[in-house]
Amino acid sequence: MDGSHYDILGIAVDAEPLEVRQAYRQRLLEAHPDKQGGVDKGAVTRIQQAYRVLSDPTQRSAYDGELAVQIAATGVHGRADALDEHSLDDFEYNEQQGVFTMACPRCSSAEGFELPEQALEENATARPGGGMQVIVQCAACSLWLKVDFDIVYTSE
């Protein structure tokens, strides 16, 4: 349950106050010790903090501004709608650096899209049909893409 307050509550950034409250209650029920077989105080604390911020218009506006700055700085985000989708298989992988790269389909910058493995781990969200997804911006232009991938575990 990592990510933004929106990710924690499982809501869209434009969610109405009623949706925020309903998601908060649902997440608390899901995190309840009787449902989880134990107490994860960290999860409950994150849910409560997300609700406190997103249910207060002033705090939410300030948080949205901070989130926008963070997204602009990293060029990677976990959620968005109406973007072109690509598979991580479309990217080239540099094993030494642990980075996936792809030329931008709009501006043709050779490594316009760069996804370090850590960015995938920290920013990915689950896709409704299974697998994971991350949103990334071209380093040379304003194009954003959804990048879909599956987590594959290998035994070493």
UniProtKB/Swiss-Prot annotation:
Pathway: Protein modification; peptidyl-diphthamide biosynthesis. Gene3D superfamilies: DnaJ domain, DPH Zinc finger. Coiled coil: none annotated. It is found in: Cytoplasm; Nucleus. Pfam families: DnaJ (PF00226), Zn_ribbon_CSL (PF05207). Required for the first step of diphthamide biosynthesis, the transfer of 3-amino-3-carboxypropyl from S-adenosyl-L-methionine to a histidine residue. Diphthamide is a post-translational modification of histidine which occurs in elongation factor 2. The DPH-type metal-binding (MB) domain can bind either zinc or iron ions. InterPro entries: DnaJ_domain, DPH3/4-like, DPH_MB_dom, DPH_MB_sf, J_dom_sf. Zn(2+) binds at C104, C107, C138, C141. This is Diphthamide biosynthesis protein 4. Belongs to the DPH4 family. GO terms for cellular component: cytoplasm; nucleus. Keywords: Cytoplasm, Iron, Metal-binding, Nucleus, Zinc. The keyword Iron applies. Residues 4-67 form the J domain. GO terms for biological process: protein histidyl modification to diphthamide. Residues 82-150 form the DPH-type MB domain. SUPFAM superfamilies: Chaperone J-domain, CSL zinc finger.
